[in-house]
Amino acid sequence: MGAMNTDVKAKYFKAISSSTVDICANQTNSGGGDMTLTTGTGVFTGGSESNRIAAAVNITSTAGDSNNGVTFNVVGIGKDGVSTVSESGITGPAGSSTVTTGQVYTKVTQIVHSGTVTNVSCGFAASTSGLVFGGRTRIRGLHGVSSATAGELQFYNNDSASGTVLLTIDTPNQDDMLDPYIPDDGVVFDSNGCFASLGTGITSVTVFYDG
């Protein structure tokens, strides 16, 4: 029997908590240049390449030193896990405060500062969402782990958490496995893509989809 061809793919999403230091920790650098990342090749959300959660970046003045006279550029990989994205001209934080990017990333590869920075750390903001696929697709199945908080796992007919929710799965208020029934033909998403929102009820989920 020959090999079976299939277009079904899988993506893994695991919710992350807000962090101050997982990208770079408490750095003081003279003049313009690059922040030194905790991993030279770039830092993934949740620290794992397999995690496709997309998150904004926190830039924090960890002490009373003000860094709002400096601008930052953040470069990395976007929510699709492939495309390079960036946000430029971000005004740095005042003393003991945080600024957050509008852009979201699955991996940060470079953070550039325009001038001297003092006691600056960078980390990912909390996130529970990510892009399943950036075009027409079908959800074929999923396997997840629920948390101790009841909630909803939602899938948007879009490439972001906006628009019509086509699939909602309630989750129990207990740590448990989640293996819901999905019809044989799947659930079709025919707009700009399919975007997953784990909410508070899901710790992680693997989504099987047409890609």
Tell where the protein language model's regions lie, with residue ranges.
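Surface-exposed, low-hydrophobicity beta-strand/loop segments enriched in small/polar/acidic residues
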Residues: M1-G211
